[in-house]
């Protein structure tokens, strides 16, 4: 464990909530370890470097799932040599150099694809340990940083993807994607459902409007699911879309088997108490579902990491892809009317999930810090960071 004063710099990004959630899980775990010699700082590199342009890019990113799918698809699946010619590779370079000079971290942890880090590792022979947490289930080129000391990945399959891309197997740890440890705690499902006037004996279907307020078609889906699966009950989470919540509350106010929620901090309890979930295939959400052994239906996943995550979970029989609301309704009907199929998915998830992901990752981070202590004692931090001035 850490016996000298050490500092970890976490570089994250606010494109969606997942990267921030991973960062918070890691920070919380390290804080729980009560390491008096360790300090952890976190920075949203792109937002701090170029706040106006990054805000515009974030809006484009959010809208790309709805309006610009082909454009985002072309970006996501572009060849590595095309990325090298793109300004994105150098985005945030000056801010990153200034951060390193100011903070002088002993280890850098990336929880967001940060191609600009490649510029530093290729052009400056820095030997500060760099670790990367990949928050999706299939490899995408932006996650690879030359000379990185460690990659933390979700599964053995993801590890094979990295090895096939030329990363040494010894540099890759299968920890699972870091999520809050509350998703591994026991929940009294019967008490939770009764507390919300739901029937513990009925299959509970959890539906989420998604982080970006998708607000159309849920009334149609709820109505048709209940027609085809009348023995079920539905919990609809509208997130921050107050208009959607009001509309659905009015439409289903007389239904005792439909509960409409707004934003909730209790997704853990709802996942634990449900048998099936309709959601977006974001890396963190589906990792939480996997930890809870909750089969999922992915409605119309966007090209890119959403689709790749959904395809992986479908290949592993953890979930199913529905390209239209009608397909989602049919899948729900099939699974709830043939409970053995749903149970088979649940059992497979229970057998194959990786537990204690955040603890595994943080323990390895501390080992890296320990192993780098001797080198730091010999060379000191100043020569490492002085290299930025001699290039």
UniProtKB/Swiss-Prot annotation:
The gene is ugtP. GO terms for molecular function: 1,2-diacylglycerol 3-glucosyltransferase activity. Its EC number is 2.4.1.315. It is found in: Cell membrane. Pathway: Glycolipid metabolism; diglucosyl-diacylglycerol biosynthesis. The lineage of its organism: Bacteria, Bacillati, Bacillota, Bacilli, Bacillales. Its main location: membrane. It catalyses: a 1,2-diacyl-3-O-(beta-D-glucopyranosyl)-sn-glycerol + UDP-alpha-D-glucose = a 1,2-diacyl-3-O-(beta-D-Glc-(1->6)-beta-D-Glc)-sn-glycerol + UDP + H(+); a 1,2-diacyl-sn-glycerol + UDP-alpha-D-glucose = a 1,2-diacyl-3-O-(beta-D-glucopyranosyl)-sn-glycerol + UDP + H(+). Processive glucosyltransferase involved in the biosynthesis of both the bilayer- and non-bilayer-forming membrane glucolipids. Is able to successively transfer two glucosyl residues to diacylglycerol (DAG), thereby catalyzing the formation of beta-monoglucosyl-DAG (3-O-(beta-D-glucopyranosyl)-1,2-diacyl-sn-glycerol) and beta-diglucosyl-DAG (3-O-(beta-D-glucopyranosyl-beta-(1->6)-D-glucopyranosyl)-1,2-diacyl-sn-glycerol). Beta-diglucosyl-DAG is the predominant glycolipid found in Bacillales and is also used as a membrane anchor for lipoteichoic acid (LTA). It comes from the Bacteria. This is Processive diacylglycerol beta-glucosyltransferase. Belongs to the glycosyltransferase 28 family. UgtP subfamily. Keywords: Carbohydrate metabolism, Cell membrane, Glycosyltransferase, Lipid biosynthesis, Lipid metabolism, Membrane, Transferase. GO terms for biological process: enterobacterial common antigen biosynthetic process; glycolipid biosynthetic process; lipoteichoic acid biosynthetic process. It comes from Staphylococcus haemolyticus (strain JCSC1435). One of its GO terms (cellular component) is plasma membrane. HAMAP family: Diacylglyc_glucosyltr. It is an enzyme of class 2 (transferase). Transmembrane segments: none annotated.
């Amino acid at each position: 464990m850490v016996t000298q004063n050490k500092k970890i710099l976490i570089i994250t990004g606010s494109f969606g909530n997942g990267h921030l959630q991973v960062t918070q899980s890691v920070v919380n775990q390290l804080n729980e370890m009560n390491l008096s010699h360790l300090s952890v700082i976190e920075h949203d590199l792109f937002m701090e470097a170029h706040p106006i342009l990054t805000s515009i890019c974030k809006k484009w990113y959010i809208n790309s799932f709805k309006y610009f799918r082909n454009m985002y698809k072309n970006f996501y699946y572009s060849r590595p040599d095309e990325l090298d010619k793109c300004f994105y590779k150098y985005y945030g370079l000056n801010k990153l150099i200034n951060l390193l000079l100011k903070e002088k971290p002993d280890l850098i942890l990336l929880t967001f694809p940060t191609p600009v880090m490649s510029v530093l590792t290729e052009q400056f022979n820095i030997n500060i340990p760099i670790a990367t947490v990949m928050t999706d289930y299939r490899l995408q080129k932006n996650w690879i940083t030359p000379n990185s000391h460690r990659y933390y990945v979700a599964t053995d399959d993801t590890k094979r993807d990295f090895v096939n891309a030329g990363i040494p197997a010894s540099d890759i740890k299968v920890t699972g994607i870091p999520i809050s440890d509350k998703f591994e705690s026991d929940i009294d499902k019967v008490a939770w459902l009764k507390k919300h006037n739901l029937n513990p004996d009925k299959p509970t279907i959890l539906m989420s409007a998604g982080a970006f307020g998708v607000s159309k078609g849920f009334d149609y889906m709820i109505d048709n699911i209940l027609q085809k699966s009348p023995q079920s009950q539905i919990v609809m989470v509208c997130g921050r879309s107050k208009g959607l919540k009001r509309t659905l509350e009015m439409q289903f106010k007389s239904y005792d088997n439909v509960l409409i929620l707004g934003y909730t901090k209790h997704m853990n309890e709802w996942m634990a108490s449900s048998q099936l979930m309709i959601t977006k295939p974001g890396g963190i959400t589906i990792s939480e579902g996997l930890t809870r052994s909750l089969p999922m239906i992915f409605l119309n996943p966007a090209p890119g990491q959403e689709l790749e995550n959904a395809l992986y979970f479908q290949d592993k029989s953890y979930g199913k892809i529905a390209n239209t609301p009608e397909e989602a309704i049919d899948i729900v009907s099939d699974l709830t009317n043939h409970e053995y199929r749903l149970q088979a998915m649940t059992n497979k998830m229970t057998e194959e999930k990786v537990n204690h992901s955040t603890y595994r990752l943080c323990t390895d981070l501390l080992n890296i810090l320990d192993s780098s202590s001797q080198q730091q004692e010999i060379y000191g931090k100043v020569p490492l960071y002085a290299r930025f001035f001699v290039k």
